[in-house]
Curated annotation (Swiss-Prot):
Self-assembles to form an icosahedral capsid with a T=16 symmetry, about 200 nm in diameter, and consisting of 150 hexons and 12 pentons (total of 162 capsomers). Hexons form the edges and faces of the capsid and are each composed of six MCP molecules. In contrast, one penton is found at each of the 12 vertices. Eleven of the pentons are MCP pentamers, while the last vertex is occupied by the portal complex. GO terms for cellular component: host cell nucleus; T=16 icosahedral viral capsid. It is found in: Virion; Host nucleus. InterPro entries: Herpes_MCP, Herpes_MCP_upper_sf. Homomultimer. Makes the hexons and eleven out of twelve pentons. Interacts with triplex proteins 1/TRX1 and 2/TRX2; adjacent capsomers are linked together in groups of three by triplexes, heterotrimeric complexes composed of one molecule of TRX1 and two molecules of TRX2. Interacts with scaffold protein; this interaction allows efficient MCP transport to the host nucleus. Interacts with capsid vertex component 2/CVC2. Interacts with the small capsomere-interacting protein/SCP. The gene is MCP. It comes from Suid herpesvirus 1 (strain Indiana S) (SuHV-1). Its main location: virion. GO terms for molecular function: structural molecule activity. This is Major capsid protein.
Length: 1330
């Protein structure tokens, strides 16, 4: 640094006068005037210059030179090919016994020069050249000073260039060593297994050890900084896993006692300080280092290739002497130049090594990154919403986390969040709401490509039943049922897969043929006859075709993937703080549904009333007497199988006509129905209607007006349904189109009617008005809730919808015997209708008597009034409808649902096999409309039902194909299986069923996810983070021969001056017969990304076919993008993405979501795993390993996959994240590398090649025969091991934040779980040290 003279303020002008040209100062003397303009001249004076001084870095004084044999080779630029020959003698062991005697074996290895160069440049301006040459000197002091300054600047430039070559030598040598240094986690397992890779078993064991070492060795200093022995173990592994050099260098490094240094550890300044302070002890603080380079001179015209055995030789005589006689070259008495410098010498194990950090000494302020500071990409995987099996839902001490007094423990509920820590130790969480950008995107419904791919392979219809819908013929329902039962066994040559109660292990077992069609959480894929539905009554014998149907509701997910325990737990959660049926209500209703002696006459009365409010009011006295008698006899509630009856009873008989405790049952029952109805609103956000339907109808199936109740008594639901023209509703009535009939009296009744007319029932008032509904639309919604949620909760599948023979019912009513009487008499009076003398065989009186129902004459006489409003028949209805606005896309618009319903049918509870009234279908016959109402026992009411049909009905619901099919129904077999298999009480089950009827569509998810309703499937959260690493490199002494040629200067003249380009050729050759260097990621420098919870938003990263309804598409975009933190991808040329308003923790890492069965094995996520659910990174694996599920998962041989919605080809997640379909890319998707076959196969082959190359301890390079360099792909072990192994690591996370606060405690607490950190960062963060 040059300092200017310190000038007193009063002498500034005098000094300028002395040091400047006199003419510059004369201006102040020459002009003396009053004109101020004469004093306007100005000039600048350079009073001082401050500059930084570069200190010359001598490479040979650095610890890095320990690993080098540095030789000056002026003729290097003329060498066409330099070769070094190694002679390696294989050691022998003399042994006794019959072994053949070993003979000496000599191996010869040739290595060629690896050519490199160093470049630097500087320029001299024209003005500086003129000053230096003297041409621009004018004899003044200023020009002399400027000339001196130009010379000084040139000297500084030359010094800077020389310094740059010294620094470049260090940088180049460090990079050379890095190129040939494999990671410790790669070399250590090979040392352990001694290169024995003869078969796949040994190779697999090696890969397993590789994974363990990557996890344990990465950041060992950060993890074990307080554990000195653990760090020393890793350092010992590092310095002992390399092979020694074959060179015996003349110039070497030693400590002050003369002990040679065995190698060098090069690392960062931070790691060096931590090692010296906590781990290593200084063996010496100074070292003797060489300060001169060896010389290699090729004299005369000898162009032979020099063979240098790692020695720094003076001339060719040394070479010849060594080759001919093998004698060491004499020193000729000339001392080798050395100097004692400041150094850190430490002992690691039994080796003395030079500890060096070049970060500040060489690289500071050079704008060149330090090679030992790298980046590590780690992909994390976290399970969200997984529900554990019952055996794992326990707590070691139930009082560890006490719930609010008086409330259920929320930790028994299915988890809806996953909690973890970000890089600053701040607790974060991801909930289902974060997944809106994925699940609420139209790509959720895009299955066209999947269908097209599945249809490429021939499909055979194994079982048409459940996959085919027929159009009913114009015939009586009883006749249609008889014909169906005759043909039913032929429709099922094999048991349909949808009816097989497969457990999760069975479904996911290797080789399961049914697994290939389980591709999407929201779609059923099945093989059906290639005909349009509804089709002919007889199933056509045509080719099969793979079809898809939306599952509509989450309850239709197979039980193997969404088990009963989970559904019940979700139902219990919803029941908390909501209405629950009183125990007396539950007992009374349950008793009625299970009563095998339920009075058959009650069904007759239901049929006579057939939902008519007018008729009910007329028969109110009779109904009240029936209820009272049944209540006194059994303490059960009558008519609870009929929603209309329950509503009318509560309205007209609940104010004193019934016993108080009996009336309370019906009131409580309806309060529960209304509570279930309110549940829909509680999980629906306010919003404008879409497609002429309110948001509640788009969110919940039972609120959807297009779904008819299973039993209807009037045309109200049909009228409300027909108002939704956007859904293209169709209604087939006995194979004909719907027509309404206001009401039918005795004179117009036609019991043989097979047309499309339906009786609407006579209204209570306003009889002369045209057709209008009897009740509002809410009545139909409550009716569906009652039949689809309340009834199954009590019946558990032990009920059946029945057709009614109204001709026989009305005949039976006319057979009643009612004696004339003017007063009420007892049953012992002959004037009472139930007196024995009035019990005429086959009369209605007998039915009342047998049921012990006490009714009087006045009540029975009113039955005669029913002829003014009669029912003709039970009519089958087949209602089909297109998807709603929240589910309609180009792919789904033709996927119409077909649901069956009965008009003027009834629901029969427990079957009474010994009641002759039911035999041979005298009054009632089975007509199941849904699997929920298809009890096999009720087939006994149909004549001529064979044993084969009865046996089949025990396993497959006997729903006729003209009333729908499983795959086309809104409510399917899994819901019925849930109701039948559930062990929950009726309150919980009713809420559980209601939760199962929430729809699965992008629009529906906007409500459910925002309201924190578990959607019925779990999610796998995938996030990739980047971490800055501090590496440590170990190199053996004299392990690299480094040649430096003659400096070459290229001169280029230009108008601005002279440009000088300096180039020095360099070359290097490895001096080992193995890997002589190794490195490891010793410490975590800093997280680069925030390790946060920024969710992926597919609206910003990819396109998809939009929703057909423009308003729905706009609603999704507005709802999902509200508060979005992810900027869109710049795909519009120069248009830049929106920049977030602010960032708190730097670069944000993106979380992506993979739909996962809620029953997935939680243990799968406790270790490193593939987010797809199936391993794909095995050494011998190809693309077939990823998708061929006929073979077991290599990592989990007992199953083919943990997630069929992600691991199979063309599955939902595969179509979403597989880059093969050009819909995803590596820049914006952490899942890309796991789902793209090209990436997975490349990494698999790279891993195989890495193992082979490392095992052979040789890897070919581009310009030499054999160099022991780092094998291709080895760098990924410390840069992106997740991509190489095709596995992601679980971080410390928990479904309950309380478990994070006690990470050393139990991992299980009822339904909540804790996942311990199994990533390479385990132990690096204090807040995540579990």
């Amino acid at each position: 640094m040059e300092r200017p003279a310190i000038l007193p303020s009063g002498q500034i002008l005098s000094n300028i006068e002395v040091h400047s040209h006199r003419a510059l100062f004369d201006i102040f003397k020459r002009f003396r005037s009053d004109d101020n303009n004469l004093y306007g001249a100005e000039f600048d004076a350079l009073l001082g210059t401050y500059c930084s001084t570069l200190s010359l870095v001598r490479f040979l004084e650095l610890g890095l030179s320990v690993a080098c044999v540095c030789t000056k080779f002026p003729e290097l630029s003329y060498v066409a090919e330099g070769t070094i020959q190694f002679e390696v003698q294989q050691p022998m062991i003399a042994r006794d016994g019959p072994h053949p005697a070993d003979q000496p074996v000599h191996n010869y290895m040739i290595k060629r020069l690896d050519r490199r160069s160093l470049n630097a440049a500087f320029s001299i301006a024209v003005e500086a050249l003129g000053l230096i040459s003297g041409e621009n000197l004018d004899g003044t002091h200023i020009s002399s000073a400027m000339r001196l300054r130009a010379i000084q600047q040139l000297a500084r430039n030359v010094q800077a260039v020389l310094d740059s070559f010294e620094r470049g030598t260090a940088d180049q040598m460090l990079r050379v060593l890095m190129e040939k240094a494999p990671p410790l986690s790669l070399l250590a397992p090979f040392t352990l297994y001694e290169g024995r890779l003869a078969d796949r078993v040994a190779c697999a064991a090696l890969v397993s050890e590789l994974k363990r070492r990557v996890r344990d060795d990465t950041f060992f200093l950060t993890k074990h900084e307080r554990n000195k022995d653990a760090v020393l173990d890793r350092l010992s592994d590092l310095v002992n896993c390399t092979a020694p050099s074959v060179a015996v260098a003349r110039m070497t490094h030693a400590d002050t006692q003369g002990r040679p240094v065995d190698g060098v550890l090069v690392t960062t300044a931070g790691v060096r300080q931590r090692l010296l302070h906590h781990v290593l002890t200084l063996a010496d603080t100074h070292a003797d280092v060489p300060v001169t380079y060896g010389e290699m001179v090729i004299a005369n015209t000898n162009l032979v290739t020099a063979l240098v055995m790692g020695k720094a030789v003076s001339n060719m005589d040394d070479v010849a002497r060594y080759l001919l006689g093998g004698e060491p070259a004499p020193d000729d008495g000339k001392p080798v130049g050395s100097a004692r410098v400041r150094a850190d010498l430490v002992v690691v194990g039994d080796r003395l090594v030079f500890l060096e950090a070049l970060e500040k000494r060489v690289y500071q302020a050079t704008q060149v990154p330090y090679p030992l500071v790298g980046n590590l990409d780690v992909t994390f995987v976290m399970p969200l919403g997984v529900f554990k099996p019952a055996a794992d839902r326990y707590a070691r001490h139930a009082g560890s986390f006490a719930p609010t007094p008086g409330l259920p423990d929320p930790r028994t509920h299915p988890p809806r969040a996953v909690h973890f820590f970000n890089k600053d130790g701040v607790p974060c969480h991801v909930t289902f709401e974060h997944a809106m950008g994925t699940l609420c995107h139209p790509s959720f419904l895009d299955v066209d490509a999947t269908l097209a791919a599945l249809r490429q392979e021939p499909a055979e219809v194994q079982c048409a039943f459940g996959a085919y819908v027929a159009d009913a013929r114009p015939d009586a329902l009883v006749g249609l049922m008889q014909r169906f039962l005759e043909e039913w066994p032929g429709m099922m040559p094999v048991r349909p897969r949808w009816a097989a109660p497969a457990a999760a292990d069975q479904l996911l077992a290797p080789g399961n043929a049914d697994l290939r069609l389980e591709l999407h959480p929201a779609f059923d894929f099945f093989v059906a006859p290639e005909v349009d539905v509804p089709g002919p009554f007889a199933v056509p014998q045509v080719m099969g075709q793979v079809r898809a149907m939306p599952r509509i509701i989450n309850g239709n997910i197979p039980l193997a993937l969404c088990p009963v325990d989970f559904r019940d737990a979700r139902g219990f959660e919803l029941s908390v703080d909501r209405h629950r049926l009183a125990p007396a209500t539950v007992a009374a209703v349950r008793g009625a549904f299970r009563d095998a002696n339920y009075p058959m006459v009650f069904y007759i009365i239901e049929a006579v009333i057939h939902g008519s409010e007018r008729t009910f009011c007329a028969l109110a006295r009779l109904v009240a007497q029936c209820i009272q008698s049944y209540w006194r006899n059994t303490h059960n509630a009558a008519f609870v199988n009929n929603f209309y009856m329950v509503m009318y009873i509560n309205t007209y008989l609940g104010n004193g006509e019934l016993p108080e405790d009996c009336a309370a049952v019906y009131k409580d029952l309806l309060e529960h129905v209304h509570a279930l109805r309110r549940l829909i609103g509680e999980f629906t956000l306010p919003g404008d209607p879409l497609g002429n339907q309110p948001q509640e109808e788009l969110n919940h199936a039972l609120a959807d007006a297009t779904l008819l109740p299973p039993l209807i008594w009037d045309c109200d639901p049909i009228l409300y349904r027909d108002g939704l023209a956007e859904r293209l509703p169709e209604l087939r009535v006995n194979g004909a189109h719907f027509q309404h009939i206001l009401w039918v009296e005795m004179a117009q009744v036609n019991f043989r009617n097979v047309g499309g007319g339906l009786v609407h029932n006579r209204p209570v008032r306003n009889e002369n008005q045209p057709l209008h509904p009897h009740h509002d639309a809410e009545w139909s919604v409550l009716s569906k809730i009652y039949y689809y949620a309340v009834v199954p909760a009590f019946s558990r599948g032990n009920c059946c919808t029945m057709g009614v023979r109204y001709d026989r019912v009305y005949q039976l009513v006319q057979t009643m015997v009612v004696p004339e009487t003017d007063e009420e008499v007892g049953t012992d009076d002959p004037r009472h209708p139930l007196h024995p003398r009035n019990l005429v065989p086959n009369s209605l009186n007998v039915l009342f008597h047998n049921a012990c129902v006490a009714v009087d004459a006045d009540a029975m006489l009113i039955l005669q009034e029913t002829v003014t409003n009669m029912a003709e028949r039970t009519t089958p209805l087949l209602a089909s409808v297109a998807p709603d606005a929240g589910m309609a896309t180009v792919a789904t618009r033709d996927m119409r649902t077909h649901d069956g319903s009965l008009h003027h049918g009834l629901l029969m509870m427990a079957y009474q096999p010994n009641d002759a009234t039911l035999l041979e279908g005298a009054f009632f016959y089975p007509a199941p409309v849904n699997a929920l109402f298809a009890c096999a026992d009720h087939l006994g009411a149909m004549r001529d039902v064979g044993a084969e049909v009865r046996a089949a009905a025990q396993h497959v619901p006997c729903v006729p194909h003209f009333l729908g099919a499983n795959y086309y129904a809104t409510v399917r077999q899994p819901v019925a299986q849930h109701a039948a298999q559930s062990r929950a009480d009726e309150n919980t089950l009713s809420y559980a069923l209601m939760a199962g009827y929430f729809k699965m569509s992008p629009v529906a998810f906007t409500h459910q996810l925002r309201r924190q309703l578990h959607p019925g499937f779990a999610l796998t959260v995938v996030r990739q983070d980047r971490f800055a690493t501090e590496n440590v490199l170990f190199a053996e002494k004299a392990s690299e021969s480094y040649f430096m040629g003659q400096m070459q200067v290229a001169r280029t003249e230009s108008g601005g001056g002279l440009h000088l380009q300096l180039t020095q050729p360099r070359a290097n050759v490895d001096l080992g017969v193995g890997f002589t260097a190794a490195y490891a990621a010793a410490a975590l420098r800093a997280p680069v990304t925030d390790m946060g919870n920024l969710p992926q938003n597919l609206f910003a990263t990819r396109g998809a076919p939009p929703m057909l309804d423009a308003d729905a598409d706009d609603y999704l975009r507005r709802t999902v993008n509200a508060g979005n933190r992810l900027a869109p991808v710049p795909v519009f040329g120069q248009m830049l993405p929106q920049v977030p308003a602010g960032l708190a923790r730097g670069q944000q890492s993106v979380c992506e979501f993979i739909a996962t069965p809620v029953s997935v094995d939680l243990a799968y996520f406790r270790r490193a795993c593939n987010p797809r659910g199936r391993a794909a990174g095995e050494v011998h694996g190809e693309e077939g390993l990823m998708f061929d599920h006929s073979h077991a998962d290599p990592a989990h041989p007992h199953r083919a996959t943990a997630n069929p919605w992600a691991s199979q080809r063309h599955s939902y997640a595969d179509r979403l994240y597989n880059g093969q379909y050009n819909m995803s890319g590596p820049a914006y998707s952490p899942c890309f590398k796991f789902f793209t076959p090209a990436e997975a196969v490349a990494k698999s082959r790279g891993l195989a090649r890495l193992i082979a190359d490392t095992g052979a301890a040789a890897s070919p390079t581009s310009n030499g025969e054999y160099q022991f360099k780092r094998p291709v792909g080895a760098g990924e072990l410390v840069e992106d091991p997740c991509a190489l192994f095709q596995e992601a690591y679980p971080p410390l996370c928990a479904s309950d934040s309380a478990l994070l606060r006690t990470p050393l405690g139990a991992e299980e607490h009822f339904a909540q779980y804790l996942i311990r950190d199994e990533s390479p960062l385990k132990g690096c963060f204090q807040h995540a040290s579990a």
